[in-house]
C-alpha cells in the first residue's frame, strides 16, 4: 500500500487541499448524489471516532476515492461477511471458558456454532502471534 497515493500527481494533491476554500453547499450541490452519500457515511464514522472536522475530512476522502476508483466498476461486498468476521473476533475475545450461555444468548447462536467460531478464531489468533515455522512466507 502506498503511503502517498498521489505523490506523482501534485495537481490532485493541490485540488484536494483546496476543498476547504469552497463553501460546502456549493461544492456538494455540483457532485453526484452517490458521492454525497459516501461523504455522509464517512462523516458519520469520523464523528463516531470523535475526529474533529469530520465533514471536511469526509469530503477529502471521497475525492481521493473518486480520483482512485472513479470511472471503474468497483464492487464493494455487502457488509454481512465483514460484520460476521468482526463479530466472530469479538466473540472470541469475550469468551472466557465460562460464559458460553451468555454469549449464546447475546449473539443468538447455538452452542456448536460458538464452539466452531472459537476454534476458527483460535487458529487465526495463534497464527497472528505465532508464525508458522515451516511456512516460506515471512509475516508482514
From Swiss-Prot:
GO CC field: host cell cytoplasm
- List required co-factors: Mg(2+)
Domain (bZIP) spans 69-90
The outcome of changing residue 83 to R is: No effect on dimerization and DNA binding. Complete loss of dimerization and DNA-binding
Family per record: Belongs to the c/mor transcriptional regulatory family.
Report the GO molecular function annotations.
DNA binding; metal ion binding
Q: State where Mg(2+) binds.
A: 26, 37, 40
- Which gene underlies this protein? C
Q: Any idea what job this protein has?
A: Positive regulator of viral late genes transcription. Responsible for the transition from middle to late gene expression. Activates the Plys, PI, PP and Pmom late promoters thereby allowing the expression of viral endolysin and structural genes. Activates Pmom promoter by unwinding the DNA, thus realigning the promoter elements and recruiting the RNAP.
Q: Which UniProt keywords apply?
A: Activator, DNA-binding, Host cytoplasm, Magnesium, Metal-binding, Transcription, Transcription regulation
Assembly and partners are described as: Homodimer.
- List locations, semicolon-separated: Host cytoplasm
Q: Which residues bind DNA?
A: 99-119
Q: What is this protein called?
A: Late transcription activator C
Effect noted on mutating residue 113 to P: Loss of DNA-binding activity
Q: Does the keyword Acyltransferase apply?
A: no
- What is the cofactor note? Binding magnesium induces a conformational change that allows DNA-binding.
Principal localization reads host cell
Q: Is the keyword Transcription in the record? A: yes
Q: What induces it?
A: Expressed in the intermediate phase of the viral replicative cycle.
Q: What is known of its domains?
A: The helix-turn-helix (HTH) motif is involved in DNA-binding. The leucine zipper (bZIP) domain is involved in dimerization.
Amino acid at each position: 500500500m502506498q503511503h502517498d497515493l498521489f505523490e506523482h500527481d501534485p495537481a490532485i494533491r493541490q485540488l484536494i487541499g483546496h476543498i476547504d476554500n469552497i463553501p460546502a453547499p456549493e461544492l456538494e450541490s455540483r457532485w453526484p448524489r452517490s458521492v454525497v452519500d459516501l461523504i455522509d457515511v464517512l462523516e458519520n464514522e469520523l464523528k463516531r471516532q470523535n475526529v474533529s472536522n469530520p465533514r471536511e475530512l469526509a469530503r477529502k476522502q471521497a475525492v481521493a476515492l473518486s480520483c482512485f476508483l472513479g470511472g471503474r466498476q468497483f464492487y464493494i461486498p455487502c457488509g454481512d461477511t465483514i460484520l460476521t468476521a468482526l463479530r466472530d473476533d469479538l466473540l472470541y475475545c469475550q469468551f472466557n471458558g465460562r460464559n458460553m450461555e451468555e454469549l449464546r444468548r447475546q449473539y443468538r447462536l447455538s452452542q456448536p456454532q460458538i464452539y466452531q467460531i472459537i476454534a476458527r478464531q483460535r487458529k487465526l489468533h495463534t497464527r497472528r502471534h505465532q508464525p508458522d515455522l515451516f511456512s516460506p512466507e515471512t509475516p508482514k
